[in-house]
Amino acid sequence: MSNATLLTAFILTGLPHAPGLDAPLFGIFLVVYVLTVLGNLLILLVIRVDSHLHTPMYYFLTNLSFIDMWFSTVTVPKMLMTLVSPSGRTISFHSCVAQLYFFHFLGSTECFLYTVMSYDRYLAISYPLRYTNMMTGRSCALLATGTWLSGSLHSAVQTILTFHLPYCGPNQIQHYFCDAPPILKLACADTSANEMVIFVNIGLVASGCFVLIVLSYVSIVCSILRIRTSEGRHRAFQTCASHCIVVLCFFGPGLFIYLRPGSRDALHGVVAVFYTTLTPLFNPVVYTLRNKEVKKALLKLKNGSVFAQGE
């Protein structure tokens, strides 16, 4: 970090909202956060205890649920504190650094993971006979490890570049958590180079992953159309549709914010709610809980037959 940094704390302005809505918003986001954590924990438990779900697709889903649980935890609790009292808006300099790092670490890891998951679906649908030999346990572990390491490297670069600048003036961040674009507006130095790096760094990562996902699904659709049975086509389309919904909910708001560095602060905050708060809640519902195999596993878990099966 730069030796010229003089600030010891920042003030978060919080989520843009009309006066008098603090209590209702606190209640809404508290419920959303609790449901997000419980929903993703339930998915982790079900996949862990049901041997029928020990497949590559659900292996990657456990990674996704784990990420979503913590991705929401990085930002939502602090947002709730800003709604409770003015003192909750203060965040120390080092806490801000940590929040920025883990936000981009988990966010970029999820971005890479979506790409890996689309590749997994491509192999499963396009090469069903060779799929088990191609997507082995070792291959899954290597792909998952690669996403975590890539996310860590990406976030480290982003965090170092952001806090290498001196911060000695205003300390009010126009956002409900520490993110690079609003933080850079407080720097006591020229930030044009940093903004360009953010645009290229995040833009290339997110756009690159999104393009690879689109290409994967174009190939998947072509393979699905060659499936002879209508039941097989319907099942393949259903699986892919769930993934596409989640991908659009995650990438759409993210690309909108980081590829528009001059966007308004209020708009930035509102759009950020979608991928920091709502997407982690949607994932267990859209991507997993609507799945027939998971529903069966949940029923077995409720009746206790899953644990009896493992004995």
Curated annotation (Swiss-Prot):
InterPro entries: GPCR_Rhodpsn, GPCR_Rhodpsn_7TM, Olfact_rcpt
Keyword GTP-binding among UniProt keywords: no
Disulfide bond sites: 96-188
Gene Ontology CC annotation, any one: plasma membrane
One MF annotation (Gene Ontology) recorded for this entry: G protein-coupled receptor activity
GO terms under biological process: detection of chemical stimulus involved in sensory perception of smell
Transmembrane portions of the chain: 24-44, 53-73, 99-119, 139-159, 197-216, 237-257, 269-289
Pfam families noted in UniProt: 7tm_4
Main location: membrane
Topology within the bilayer: Multi-pass membrane protein
Function: Odorant receptor.
Family, similarity comment: Belongs to the G-protein coupled receptor 1 family.
Protein name from the UniProt record: Olfactory receptor 10G7
Organism in which the protein naturally occurs: Homo sapiens
